[in-house]
Amino acid sequence: MDNNYALPPSGRTPVWRHITKAAKSGDFILQVCQACETVQYPPRELCKDCLQDKLEWQKLSPQGELISHTNLHASTNAFFRRYLPRKIALIKMDCGPIIFAHIAYSDAKTGDRLTIMSKRDLSGEGVFIALTDLIEANVQLDQLNKLLLQD
């Protein structure tokens, strides 16, 4: 039997390490191009708009609007198969980009305002968690902690 099922996949790009570091304190950070001020997601080495390499990590507003969500009912990864179905979402951030996040509140609807929190998953990598203000954050996080969060 393969014992690798115990943890979520840990492969991320080296650029992602900044998000993992920020997740220790729960900060929401993204790269901002110092040449054209475009906020970047996903993290990258060159600006998606002007191709400059002047990207700086900044703490940004964690607020956004839910634009799409779905329940995952299948996975090719053994770890995630144990925790299906799971809700994931696309959130249009007030600071600009659309990000992918795990969503903690199962009744969230398109158009709902959400707050993004950085957390570490069981492999120690940073992930984004979308929370609603309709329910206490600790209640929402308890559901995800059982599944995939370290802290």
How would you describe each model-predicted region?
Residues 1-28, 122-139:
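A broadly conserved sequence feature marking short terminus-proximal activation segments
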Residues 32-35, 46-52:
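Short, cysteine/histidine-rich loop/knuckle motifs that typically chelate Zn2+
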Residues 41, 54-56:
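Short functional micro-motifs and their immediate structural scaffolds
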Residues 64-67, 103:
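Conserved hydrophobic positions within beta-strands
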Residues 69-74:
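Short, conserved beta-turn/loop elements at beta-strand boundaries and strand-helix junctions
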Residues 82-98:
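Short, basic/aromatic beta-hairpin or loop at an interaction surface
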Residues 96-151:
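Well-ordered alpha/beta subsegment
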